[in-house]
From Swiss-Prot:
Organism: Miscanthus streak virus (isolate 91) (MiSV)
Compartment(s) where it occurs, according to its Swiss-Prot or TrEMBL record: Virion; Host nucleus
Keyword DNA-binding carried by entry: yes
Pfam families to which the protein is assigned, alphabetical: Gemini_coat (PF00844)
Record bears the keyword Lipoprotein: no
UniProt-recorded name of the protein: Capsid protein
InterPro entries noted in UniProt: Gemcoat_MSV, GV_A/BR1_coat, Viral_coat
Domain of life: Viruses
């Protein structure tokens, strides 16, 4: 009779091992028999403040890309204590509205979004043309992952956000004798992504930027759909975005 091998992941011994690893990395114990809670890292989608200007919204043009899974080393609950992390969940809570020039255009607008996994980052954030075949740069809905890079880039999630513009700047007061039609020109986007399972291997460095990632980067790609005809063809349609993100992750492996 073949004896079944004991699965340490579901045994008391396995729980004890996980408890020891958790205490060694964080200095805190958790009850044996319970899973270690996910760590949480929060950051804002905004331009950083300087000595002369406050923080502000970021701009989404016909093609914008940001790294999402930035986690610096350390012993805090929002840091990585080892060289491998697993990102399980991510929230995205932002507000979007047309830029000042874009608000002068009358019509509907759309922002296309992608969460893209990069299996083999090169130390710099790639261009959108490295990820997608961009036959029509103005219209993100036509983009597909480049055939030559399908083994490197994987689209984890894809979605869109719509808003409108009446030709009047956002928040403009009513002028005497002029009527402005109310439109949905300030919109919210609230997303919660589960089962991402983005495994990242980090270099032995002191930061958590793209240059520190050996394997497994995650990017937020965005495209404001441009106008196909009319006066707006000469205008670079821009969407402003501001908000926050939370990463829910665990550290894995040895010190």
């Amino acid at each position: 009779m073949v004896q079944k091998r004991k699965d340490l992941r579901r045994s008391d011994a396995g729980s004890a091992v996980r408890a020891k690893l958790h205490k060694a990395s964080t200095g805190k114990a958790f009850p044996v028999g319970k899973r270690a809670p996910l760590q949480i890292r929060s950051y804002a989608w905004e331009t950083p403040a300087t000595a002369t200007t406050p923080s502000g919204p970021i701009s989404i043009t016909d093609g914008t890309i940001f790294m999402c899974n930035t986690i610096d080393p350390g012993t805090g609950d929002d840091q990585r204590s080892r060289h491998t992390t697993m990102l399980y969940k991510m929230s995205l809570n932002v507000v979007l509205w047309p830029g000042a020039t874009t608000a002068q255009i009358v019509g509907p607008f759309r922002v296309n979004f992608w969460l893209v996994y990069d299996a083999a980052p090169t130390g710099v954030v790639p261009k959108l043309t490295d990820i997608f075949d961009v036959a029509y740069p103005k219209w993100g809905n036509t983009w597909q992952v480049s055939r030559s890079n399908v083994h490197r880039f994987i689209v984890k999630r894809k979605w869109k956000v719509d808003y409108q513009s009446s030709g009047v700047p956002v928040g403009k007061r009513q002028s005497s004798g002029v009527e402005y039609a109310p439109v949905n020109n300030v919109v919210e986007c609230n997303k919660f992504f589960e089962k991402l399972r983005v495994k990242t291997e980090w270099a032995n460095t002191s930061t958590g930027a793209i240059g520190d990632v050996k394997k497994g980067a995650l990017y937020l790609c965005a495209n404001t759909r441009q106008m196909p005809a009319g006066d707006s063809v000469t205008t670079s349609c821009t969407t402003m975005m501001q908000g926050s993100t939370r990463l829910y992750f665990k550290v894995l492996g040895n010190q």
